[in-house]
Amino acid sequence: MTSRLFALIPCAGTGSRSGSALPKQYRTLAGRALLHYTLAAFDACSEFAQTLVVISPDDAHFDARRFAGLRFAVRRCGGASRQASVMNGLIQLAEFGATDADWVLVHDAARPGITPALIRTLIGALKDDPVGGIVALPVADTLKRVPAGGDAIERTESRNGLWQAQTPQMFRIGMLRDAIQRAQLEGRDLTDEASAIEWAGHTPRVVQGSLRNFKVTYPEDFDLAEAILAHPARAS
């Protein structure tokens, strides 16, 4: 039987670094909620059996009317960390018929520059891979190491072989769930899915990402994201 595709959007964060009381995924960019762009990109890919958005149990800001016409489901099962939210979402996917052998693409709600073309590039590159992988970009900037709380440069780090992880990150549901569970049991709170897969002893692959697909984090990022989203992505 052919493995199916599911998308999982952890959306339980408060966006404390964004400088706004409103969680960043609900802020308006170029006329739409930031989250809308992610949902629209996955909605445009008919290959997906379901897209699941995981929000906090006490989220008072989510309004389904802002995303009318898009195909997705919502579950209020967000946890105290991204890792916990993803784990809870993976468990919820069984409700939609997902099996351990199916693929899940986990994507940050705060990366509105994702495109259907990039999603399909990732799927095409990894659909026959035994592990899976992520979209990422080679590090372009020179890297400096500075001690915590300080401002003096200790040394310059080599950027050779370094890639900046993005999302989506694509893995088999069973493998990812087991990897996160193992990390949790060992007291590790990892910041992305690939880290959990690596922790479990597997080797994910990288697929070339896009500068457009950056993560909106700080207040100044909103202006940049709005400028990008105001112009349609070029077809690849």
Swiss-Prot record:
Organism domain of life: Bacteria
Keywords on record: Isoprene biosynthesis, Nucleotidyltransferase, Transferase
Site (Transition state stabilizer): 17, 24
Enzyme Commission numbers on file: 2.7.7.60
One Pfam match: IspD
GO molecular function ontology, one term from the record: 2-C-methyl-D-erythritol 4-phosphate cytidylyltransferase activity
Pathway assigned to this chain's UniProt record: Isoprenoid biosynthesis; isopentenyl diphosphate biosynthesis via DXP pathway; isopentenyl diphosphate from 1-deoxy-D-xylulose 5-phosphate: step 2/6
Keyword Manganese: no
Catalytic reactions of this protein: 2-C-methyl-D-erythritol 4-phosphate + CTP + H(+) = 4-CDP-2-C-methyl-D-erythritol + diphosphate
GO-annotated biological processes: isopentenyl diphosphate biosynthetic process, methylerythritol 4-phosphate pathway
Site residues (Positions MEP for the nucleophilic attack), renumbered to this chain: 159, 215
Similarity annotation: Belongs to the IspD/TarI cytidylyltransferase family. IspD subfamily.
Function according to Swiss-Prot or TrEMBL: Catalyzes the formation of 4-diphosphocytidyl-2-C-methyl-D-erythritol from CTP and 2-C-methyl-D-erythritol 4-phosphate (MEP).
UniProt-listed HAMAP family: IspD
Cited PANTHER family: 2-C-METHYL-D-ERYTHRITOL 4-PHOSPHATE CYTIDYLYLTRANSFERASE, CHLOROPLASTIC (PTHR32125:SF4)
Protein name, entry field: 2-C-methyl-D-erythritol 4-phosphate cytidylyltransferase
Organism per entry: Burkholderia thailandensis (strain ATCC 700388 / DSM 13276 / CCUG 48851 / CIP 106301 / E264)
Gene giving rise to this polypeptide: ispD
